[in-house]
Amino acid sequence: MRLRVRRGDKEILTHPHRMLMDKKIKFAVIGCGHIGKRHAEMVTRDPGAELVALCDIRPREELGIEAYDVPFFSSLMELLQSGISIDVVNVCTPNGLHAAMAIQAVETGCNVVIEKPMALTLADAEKVVYASLKYRKQVFCVMQNRYSPPSVWIKEMVDSGRLGKIYMVQLNCYWNRDERYYKPGGWHGDAALDGGTLFTQFSHFIDIMYWLFGDICNIQARFADFNHAGLTAFEDSGLVNFNFVNGGMGSLSYSTSVWNRNMESSMLIVAENGSVKIGGQYMNEVEYCHIKDYEMPELAPTNPGNDYGPYKGSAQNHNFVIRNVVRVLSGASSECITTNVLEGMKVVDIIQRIYALK
């Protein structure tokens, strides 16, 4: 089917799918902290996206968002009732608010991008999934480390079977988060709003592990709070051992008690046909690759980590997240959601099962 549309003085025939591709996707960002501003910046840079609103409970003047000449709202309800045309709400608020705000946006007809984690409990994550299905809206979970060249490469290696059977996987996450991060009056470190170290700092790497090797079982864990007493309501370190449902065994060693700056986020894989270690501060470089009948290709450089002044985060790949949202909602036939709501829910499930052993 083709439609007649007028462009200037000309009337042309076009396909409805083409009209959808030409339409800019309208984004509203709720939560204008470090990561919310990153979302706003990436939306304005994408040629297929348009930033139409910002929202935060703090006064606009305190947020450093002068570059964005769009309407500003002090609550999600006020935003959703404003009459502004919105295709996507980007939820960049404290972790404990993600699920409820995502559901509220979906119920009013918006698609949603949820920063990690999508929820702090499996029950709340399931409610987001239910709302997405009930109202037929897409929910995109932000796990931007999937876009880093080493992640793309190792995913292809695992899925192609080149590594053979997976024997052992060791995930190490050693970062610094101290009083420069856990500030008085902030939500970081709060049990209800933050949720814990695995949710806030290391869910990206648990997502990569799940993406590559699937679910885990037979979990054993030990936890410690070495130097965050009075700063957080939870552990700063842990040792976790488990089996993979698909075969093989794994471990996770993590800590935010590292002095002064991040040390590493790495994954070591021992498999039937070889071994690989991906390392760096946020799994941004292949440090070791020795695989049967295989020569390691040169990979594109990974984007640098998000820079928050005294502390650093994961790779600056939010541009890929926004591009994926635009292409999916514009009807690109070859595009699928990079991290869908079911995968986001699975990461919450894994972390909840680990924390249940405290």
PLM features per residue range, with description:
Residues 309-323, 339:
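Active-site loop of classical SDR/Rossmann-like NAD(P)-dependent oxidoreductases
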Residues 126-145, 165-171:
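Rossmann-fold dehydrogenase core element
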Residues 20-21, 78, 88-90, 245, ...:
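C-terminal helix-rich "cap/oligomerization" subdomain common to oxidoreductases
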Residues 17-68, 326:
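N-terminal Rossmann-like dinucleotide-binding module
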Residues 39, 70-131:
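Beta-loop-alpha module in the N-terminal Rossmann-like domain of NAD(P)-dependent dehydrogenases
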Residues 74, 114-115, 139-141, 278:
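Hydrophobic residues in well-ordered beta-strands that form the structural core
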